[in-house]
Amino acid sequence: SFYATGLTDEKMRGQLRGFQASLNEYGDEDKSIPKDWFDAFTRLRKLLEGDKVDREPVNNKTVILLDELPWMDTAKSDFKSALDYFWNSWASAQEDLVLIACGSATSWIITNLLTDKKGFHNRVTRRIHLAPFSLAECEKLFEFNDIVMPRNQMIESYMVFGGIPHYLNLLDQRLSLAQNINELCFKEYGYLHNEYYNLFHSLYDK
């Protein structure tokens, strides 16, 4: 399978440089930066037509995972047009190919993929909505991580971390909930110290 991710606050050339690095990682021997997104997807097609990209062992399909896809679509980059052309001219006809598009900017995904009237119209086969864990699921996660916590503190942790498994996995079983919150959120070098500002900026570009 092939994985590439968009880069925050990078213009077109920076995005293409990142995509080129992914192409090289999966076996593309061309070390030059693609001149545009049409060139980038042409190189991806050639790579996938070869035998360097492994198939998924479960279903024998080739998966293209484009993470933070909206960040790739910078101003005047023609990214969406190139993606449309790649998908409609070749990729959609490959029965063993799956394209997974991810992005924190959900408005872009909705406008350009889910409700698109052009290139991706009626092309989406499945929408994956990743909901936060319920309180019961959080309790199971705590048990799995050997974290002993009374239920009132589980509720408090849910109010702070919102049932997001990635955040809950950061909790240190040796510390109380209050100590964990202090270490993660309020210490200068805490893992989540700047998380609010990072999320706000990525969602609203402010």
Language-model regions, residue ranges each:
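Phosphate-binding site recognition
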Residues: 1-206
